[in-house]
């Protein structure tokens, strides 16, 4: 039978673990509020520029931009956004499962995939898988700077413009609320025309000054940058929300484990006391008989 000393040591150990997970939960709550506010403030810009792109693609363009060109898919590129740290439940695992499933589906029809990786977790997984990694960026922090992302994104855009890559996807965790975050994979290039009822019903078109090429090049590049940056903000907010839930679950489980150990401790202590009483009674009986 386990001694009371061993059980006490276990209770102390679990109690210390509970203090750590509770502290991590509180830190995650604080960081999540800040990152959620930052993420939500960026959504209007990302949505509006997406709407402008939808309107542009519905118009009659004199200049046919390469980002609008549909071509035969011989090779794809994927931007994968993960966390740098763990302890956030199945956030990264669920995303990687979907990414690997998509990559494997393309591989079945002999379409290879090049990767741009953001986050240490994606780097460790896809490096182990032997994937072709074009660029990587890690340790972006809570408030990443756009300048830190442009170089990595520019590499895959250059591959697309040189027609070495025919489609680009972006994979990240989309923040829905504090309790749910969804792994998401969307096509970044070429631009897919959405069925925008407002845009299709309008007979107007844009006038470009000084020239459509200059305007569209700038607009499309801003769009790509905004989508990647917003996806990273979504993933950071999702990370802290998932970590908050994971640490709360760990704290609750620690509390339950402490109660179980306390019950075992009381039972062992009671058994020891009963045994000692029996020994005393037996000893007293032996003395009285003598």
Curated annotation (Swiss-Prot):
<comment type="function">
    <text>Produces ATP from ADP in the presence of a proton gradient across the membrane. The gamma chain is believed to be important in regulating ATPase activity and the flow of protons through the CF(0) complex.</text>
</comment>
<dbReference type="GO" id="GO:0005886">
    <property type="term" value="C:plasma membrane"/>
</dbReference>
<dbReference type="InterPro" id="IPR000131">
    <property type="entry name" value="ATP_synth_F1_gsu"/>
</dbReference>
<dbReference type="GO" id="GO:0042777">
    <property type="term" value="P:proton motive force-driven plasma membrane ATP synthesis"/>
</dbReference>
<keyword id="KW-0406">Ion transport</keyword>
<keyword id="KW-0375">Hydrogen ion transport</keyword>
<dbReference type="GO" id="GO:0046933">
    <property type="term" value="F:proton-transporting ATP synthase activity, rotational mechanism"/>
</dbReference>
<dbReference type="InterPro" id="IPR023632">
    <property type="entry name" value="ATP_synth_F1_gsu_CS"/>
</dbReference>
<comment type="subunit">
    <text>F-type ATPases have 2 components, CF(1) - the catalytic core - and CF(0) - the membrane proton channel. CF(1) has five subunits: alpha(3), beta(3), gamma(1), delta(1), epsilon(1). CF(0) has three main subunits: a, b and c.</text>
</comment>
<dbReference type="GO" id="GO:0005524">
    <property type="term" value="F:ATP binding"/>
</dbReference>
<keyword id="KW-0472">Membrane</keyword>
<keyword id="KW-0813">Transport</keyword>
<comment type="similarity">
    <text>Belongs to the ATPase gamma chain family.</text>
</comment>
<dbReference type="Pfam" id="PF00231">
    <property type="entry name" value="ATP-synt"/>
</dbReference>
<dbReference type="InterPro" id="IPR035968">
    <property type="entry name" value="ATP_synth_F1_ATPase_gsu"/>
</dbReference>
<protein>
    <recommendedName>
        <fullName>ATP synthase gamma chain</fullName>
    </recommendedName>
</protein>
<keyword id="KW-1003">Cell membrane</keyword>
<keyword id="KW-0066">ATP synthesis</keyword>
<keyword id="KW-0139">CF(1)</keyword>
<dbReference type="GO" id="GO:0045259">
    <property type="term" value="C:proton-transporting ATP synthase complex"/>
</dbReference>
């Amino acid at each position: 039978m386990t001694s009371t000393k061993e059980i006490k040591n276990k209770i102390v150990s679990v109690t210390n673990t509970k203090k750590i997970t509770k502290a991590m939960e509180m830190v995650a709550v604080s960081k999540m509020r800040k990152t959620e506010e930052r993420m939500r403030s960026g959504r209007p810009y990302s949505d509006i520029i997406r709407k402008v792109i939808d309107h542009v693609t519905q118009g009659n363009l004199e200049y046919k931009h390469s980002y609008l060109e549909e071509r035969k898919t011989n090779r794809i590129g994927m931007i994968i956004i993960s966390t740098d740290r763990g302890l956030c439940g199945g956030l990264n695992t669920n995303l990687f499962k979907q990414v690997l499933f998509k990559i494997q589906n393309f591989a079945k029809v002999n379409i290879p995939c090049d990767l741009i990786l953001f986050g240490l977790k994606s780097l460790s997984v896809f490096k182990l898988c032997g994937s072709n990694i074009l660029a990587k960026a890690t340790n972006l922090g809570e408030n990443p700077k756009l300048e830190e992302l442009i170089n990595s994104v520019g590499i895959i855009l250059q591959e697309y413009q040189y027609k070495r890559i025919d489609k680009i996807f972006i994979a990240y965790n989309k923040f829905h609320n504090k309790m749910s975050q969804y792994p998401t994979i969307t096509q970044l290039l070429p631009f897919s025309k959405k069925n925008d009822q407002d845009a299709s019903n309008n007979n107007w078109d844009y006038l470009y000054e000084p020239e459509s090429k200059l305007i569209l090049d700038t607009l499309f590049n801003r769009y790509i940058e905004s989508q990647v940056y917003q996806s990273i903000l979504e993933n950071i907010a999702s990370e802290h929300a998932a970590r908050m839930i994971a640490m709360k679950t760990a704290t609750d489980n620690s509390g339950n484990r402490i109660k179980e150990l306390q019950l075992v401790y009381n039972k062992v202590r009671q058994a020891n006391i009963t045994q000692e009483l029996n020994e005393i009674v037996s000893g007293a009986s032996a003395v009285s008989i003598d």
